[in-house]
Amino acid sequence: MKKLFQFILIIFISSPLFGQSNICSNGKMNNFTKVFEYNKMAYPGDDSFDAAYYKLNLDINYDTRFLIGEVTVSGKSKADNLSSIFLDLQNSFTVDSVIYNNQKLSFTHLSAKLNLSFPNPLSMNDEFSVVVFYKGTPGSSGFGSFEFSRTPTNHPAIWTLSEPYGASDWWPCKDSQADKVDSSDVIVTADESFVTVSNGKLISVTDNGNGTKTYYWKNSYPIAQYLISLAMANYATFSETWNYTDSDTMQVIHYNYPENLTSSRINQLKKTIPMLDVFSELYGLYPFINEKYGHAEFGWGGGMEHQTVSSMGSFGEGIVSHELAHQWFGDKITCADWHNIWLNEGFATYSEALWLEKAYGKNSYDSQINSEMGNPNQWWTAKAASGPLYVQDISSVNSIFNSARSYAKGAVVLHMLRGVLGDEDFFRTLHEYSNHPEFAFKAAVTEDFQSVAESVSNKDLDYFFSEWIYGENYPKYNFSYYINPATSNLEVSISQKSNSNPTFFTMPIKLRIRNSEIDSIYTVFNDQQNQIFEFPEIKSITSVSFDPGNWIMKDLTFVTGIDDENMIPDKFELFQNYPNPFNPTTSIEYTIPSNEYVNLKVYDILGNEVAQLVNEKKDAGNYKVNFDGDKLTSGLYIYKIKAGKFSQVRKMMLLK
């Protein structure tokens, strides 16, 4: 990681608009690569109970790299006759005993699962609490989950980074971010030279009189397991008080390695309070106002949005704003699964641009967005992203923490949604989503965010989310304009090169039209691959600018005239349906370069015909049909087209 981070730093220095969120993404990718090997079978945790409370009481010996733990897990049964549950805990630990109602439970600890058997089965909604006594050397992925390390001046340091599946490397838990506990306590006893930092408020520091101290941190807000953290070193602190209103005040405290707490670092840290002001204005009051915010320096090159205290290896303005924004999007509202990681990382990356806009003006915002869009030769930018924004394979590190997709493209999608909705509805959407009672301090998926955007704007946004979240790539437009000699009206021609999924993009497009009398913005709704828009009121033209505000990620080619033959596809093709997987509807697109009789059918995996979508003669062109699987069961389906001598087959997945 040191070499990787140096490489990233060189790129960042050479390109000042290169978002610092990329530092975050590459570190997380390195972390995930190593922890996933041991944890993939545990995901998504035991769904037979709701976790409600965690209490970690840890005794950590730095010299021997040994941890003795007592962890309380409280929860509620989600089933009748529940006789057993399991917690996630790596096999490197020895479990001494598990206590339930003052008696020892029988247990087994195999394949990173701690299986517990209750003496009497639990009924639906029965509450329980178990205490696990365990010991051993915590797992280390090289950059988390639990690291014994040293500061630049060689003082001992300890830190954790549990995203995505690393919590069970150092404590027993339900390893699923969708099931947040209502509160948590972290109590750590270690050598007296350590200052121990964790989530929430510091309740007490006890000098034990034997060369150790005990720190007690209490978190009173819902929290996901991977956001519970430790950062321990000989910290020096810099703190300020944030006064948002007369009644909304909070301590902002930064824990730094003493040798790094320079005037330059302090100036970087002082950006935090104006950022708190900006994000509270945009998203609602800082979510954990009754506790704290701040940073704890640690030995990893990026940043990690641990709740109420981001762990930081660098302190540039971009990454400070990125990790702070995560307190709303990632911590307050957590993506319910890693398929939807863009709800965390895309939102935080876009918040970097919003901070620049508020602090330095719209030009800074535009420059940042242009940088995030990038080009296909810049691997970290949105145009280089491959595959859907919705992560198909959460076993792939490059899919989850991919800089181009989850970070850059996620941010660009929000920028484009802003263009579709307009500022008023867009910022209302962000605010209402952040404060929605169904999602705030809980977990959400993409459909939840879409529902808020549609409710606020009163617009059907299926087309937008289908193509930008579940589709891939971006539109490549050909554009021309002219005065039609037959009508004397302005006509604007827009065509798109064929894509795979979707075949073409449906988007509202802004046009700036100028002549001697007008200079105005018009919006057209482009929902065909080849489309001509007529403006009967405009008889002369100086120029037409396509998407002058750069609200769409695109490639644009200006052509000087219209050639109708170029609008006819040059080959037969059946495209991948989108979205895919789908529930219950999806779209299937195809092209035919000549007039043909077309037959398009859907079959189940056994070869039984379940639907006939097309059975008629079609003119040459581009077509889209919808398929509704509402009455079908989940599974793999086949769709096949025949057009003249051409035939092609593709697969699609219905998931209910």
Regions inferred by a protein language model and the residue ranges of each:
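N-terminal, polar/Ser/Thr-rich
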Residues: 20-68, 153, 461-463, 467
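Hydrophobic helix-coil surface modules that form long, contiguous segments used
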Residues: 69, 160-163, 174-321, 350
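Zinc-dependent metallopeptidase catalytic helix centered on the HExxH motif
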Residues: 310-371
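Acidic/His/Gly-enriched intrinsically disordered linker/tail segments
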Residues: 345, 349-412, 416, 420, ...
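Glycine-centered coil/turn sites that cap beta-strands in beta-rich domains
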Residues: 563-578, 582-602, 612, 624-627, ...
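Short, surface-exposed loop/turn motifs with a glycine/proline- and acidic-biased composition
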Residues: 614-649
